[in-house]
Amino acid sequence: MKLVLASSSPRRLELLGRLGVTPDRIISPDIDESPRKGELPRDYVLRMAQEKAAAVERADDEILVAGDTTVAVGRRILGQAGDAAEQRKFLELVSGRRHHVMSAVCVIAADGKARTKLSDSIVKFKRFEASEIEAYIATGEGQGKAGGYAIQGTAEAFVTWMSGSYSGIMGLPLYETRNLLISAGYPLG
């Protein structure tokens, strides 16, 4: 059974490796990732994972995995920080407060059946000093990341509390992914 990873994220590739899985092909789906007007974060991240999966061609003998992660402050979706100004804004929003990190994974089995699961985790950061935000931005590790930070990097030192899936916060919830792969017939130990 062959596996296709529909993602260019090095974190998703690393996380699949933790399951002992190496994709046979990696393809980055090209879709519009803009939220729809009034779309809730939960609906958005599920739709993104499903659209990414549907955007990649798959052979009959292939299982496909796609995922998406978003950070939500209330109903507000914080996508990938495009530049330092946006990252600063995101970090100011999550400073000292709880926020949700939602990670959806969609697996399409060899028979074409798609299954999707959602992991919803909560993270609380300390209240940031302006100098801490600037120092973090200078590391570059949060650039292009949902919410403007990477939990697996130096941002982890700012976490005062979290609940949920650490791998989901990183970008691919392993529990949900493992179960979806097994239900799709992918051989896991």
Regions found by a protein language model. Give the residues of each.
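Anionic-ligand binding patches
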Residues: 2-4, 40-189
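Cofactor-binding loop segments of dinucleotide-utilizing enzymes, especially the Rossmann-like FAD-
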Residues: 8, 29, 110
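Surface-exposed, flexible loop/turn segments at secondary-structure boundaries
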Residues: 11, 32-34, 113
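Short acidic/polar alpha-helix capping motifs at helix-coil junctions
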Residues: 18-19, 34, 97
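A short beta-strand-loop structural module common to alpha/beta enzyme folds
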Residues: 23-34
